């Protein structure tokens, strides 16, 4: 009889918990009804990626072609093979849906609201053309374990779908490939300016979701992002600093109408790599010297594998095509050539300068920002991106001084932490052990940022993080790394 009572009581409690979860989801979705559409809300016993249900399967959104929505792939892109350690389970609410105001129907947003909340919110950008699940390994698992609520978005775009060479917006995967893809962000109504808009909109909606779930708004809000997501962080702190308390930019994309930018930096790599490969990867070849003088880090070769070769096959040309199709659409991508594209020449032949200026990073940040970048990044070379942005921040602060800004002690802090031998794709360390991971340093920088914002501690100075080292208050190498590569 006692077992019957216990079973009945257990069933009642389970039913009560299920009803409570449904009520919580219902109330939260009702609060977000004007901001989030087609939303799925679920109570999760574990919001970390230890739970297989946390990140949905690739191609799991109905009605979309393959590769348009690839969350499993997306979360692995920016994270090393050794993912963020997970030491606890975190129950809470997860919501995924569309941003209602988006006329294209592509803008998506993700919320993770842990039951054990620290009163703060993290807003995440997305790299490349990746989904709102891009930061699951690198950022979500890290900040959720500290009690942060987490919101992420997809820059207002889906990923891509397979197409043919006949598609005027098609981009081949690399110069040797016969596979063409169509990026959604090259469609009409998808200007790159939306990337900033949806980062800031995610912050606004995220704060509303937090207030609806916990009964109060977050007392602190931080922005984090990698690559194009790092660009989103920069632009967020430049355009809407009132929404944030600080940000971490992990190898963000630098955009300047005068240059450097991707349209100016990628063609020399595309043009010279085939001759370099034909030379047997000879570092003394003219082609290799051309890449180095353009600002690229030295190549690494292991057997038949080349670090430059990985970027040539996976990133350089397809990225140039994606940006050129959006920013300089009148250029004949493959008829005139990708490696021979000249940004300077195109300034007088098209509106590309104005289009790039509309999305440019200004350096005029309104809240503290830390950039973490690797010296061996061969997609966004450090001299052309991280260091260029640091110079832009310095120039913006200098301009404020010239205009008579007397409140200098309240200017937002900026730091550049360079990772010796760090690389854009952490997983490449599996092939080239000489490389160093960026993710641990980006996560450490996040902790340093929050400590500085919340407790007034000084951020460590700009520095080169030596191989095997960490960010320190008294760095052995302040400022820039002396060389882009340190062997063996």
Regions found by a protein language model. Name each.
Residues 4-15:
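Bacterial N-terminal signal peptides
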Residues 17-21:
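Sec/Tat signal peptide C-region and signal peptidase I cleavage site
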Residues 22-488:
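C-terminal His-loop and adjacent cap/lid subdomain of alpha/beta-hydrolase
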């Amino acid at each position: 009889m006692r077992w019957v009572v216990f079973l009945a009581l257990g069933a009642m409690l389970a039913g009560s918990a299920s009803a409570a979860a449904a009520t919580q989801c219902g109330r939260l979705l009702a609060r977000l009804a004007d901001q989030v559409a087609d939303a799925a809300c679920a109570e999760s016993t574990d919001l970390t990626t230890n739970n297989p249900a946390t990140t949905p399967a690739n191609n799991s959104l109905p009605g979309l072609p393959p590769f348009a929505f690839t969350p499993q792939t997306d979360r692995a892109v920016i994270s090393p093979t050794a993912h963020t350690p997970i030491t606890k389970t975190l129950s809470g609410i997860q919501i995924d849906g569309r941003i209602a105001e988006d006329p294209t129907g592509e803008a998506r947003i993700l919320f993770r609201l842990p039951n054990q909340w620290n009163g703060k919110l993290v807003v995440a950008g997305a790299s490349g053309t990746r989904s709102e699940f891009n930061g699951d390994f690198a950022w979500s698992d890290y900040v959720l374990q500290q009690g942060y609520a987490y919101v992420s978005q997809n820059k207002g775009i889906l990923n891509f779908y397979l197409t043919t060479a006949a598609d005027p917006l098609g981009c081949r995967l690399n110069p040797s490939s016969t596979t063409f893809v169509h990026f959604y962000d090259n469609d009409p109504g998808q200007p790159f300016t939306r990337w900033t808009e949806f980062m800031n909109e995610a912050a606004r909606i995220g704060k509303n979701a937090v207030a609806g779930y916990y009964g109060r708004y977050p007392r602190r809000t931080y922005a984090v992002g990698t690559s194009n997501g790092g660009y989103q962080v920069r632009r967020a702190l430049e355009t809407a600093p009132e929404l944030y308390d600080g940000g971490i930019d992990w190898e963000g994309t630098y955009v300047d109408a005068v240059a450097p930018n991707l349209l100016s930096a990628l063609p020399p790599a595309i043009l010279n790599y085939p001759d370099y490969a034909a030379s047997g990867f000879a570092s003394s070849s003219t082609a290799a010297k051309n890449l180095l003088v353009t600002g690229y880090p030295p190549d690494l070769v292991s057997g038949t594998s080349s670090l430059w070769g990985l970027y040539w096959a996976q990133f350089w040309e397809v990225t140039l095509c994606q940006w050129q199709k959006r920013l300089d659409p009148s250029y004949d991508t493959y008829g005139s050539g990708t490696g021979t594209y000249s940004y300077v020449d195109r300034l007088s032949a098209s509106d590309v300068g104005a289009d790039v200026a509309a999305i440019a990073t200004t350096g005029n940040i309104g809240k503290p920002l830390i950039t973490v970048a690797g010296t061996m990044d061969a997609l966004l070379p450090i001299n052309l991106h991280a260091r260029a942005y640091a110079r832009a921040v310095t120039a913006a602060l200098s301009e404020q001084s010239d205009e008579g800004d007397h409140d200098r002690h309240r200017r937002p802090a900026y730091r550049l932490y360079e990772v010796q031998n760090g690389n854009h794709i952490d997983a490449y360390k599996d092939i080239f052990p000489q490389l160093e991971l960026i993710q641990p340093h980006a996560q450490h920088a996040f902790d340093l940022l929050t400590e500085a914002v919340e407790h007034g501690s000084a951020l460590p100075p700009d520095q080169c993080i030596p191989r095997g080292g960490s960010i320190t208050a008294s760095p052995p190498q302040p400022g820039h790394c002396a060389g882009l590569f340190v062997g063996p």
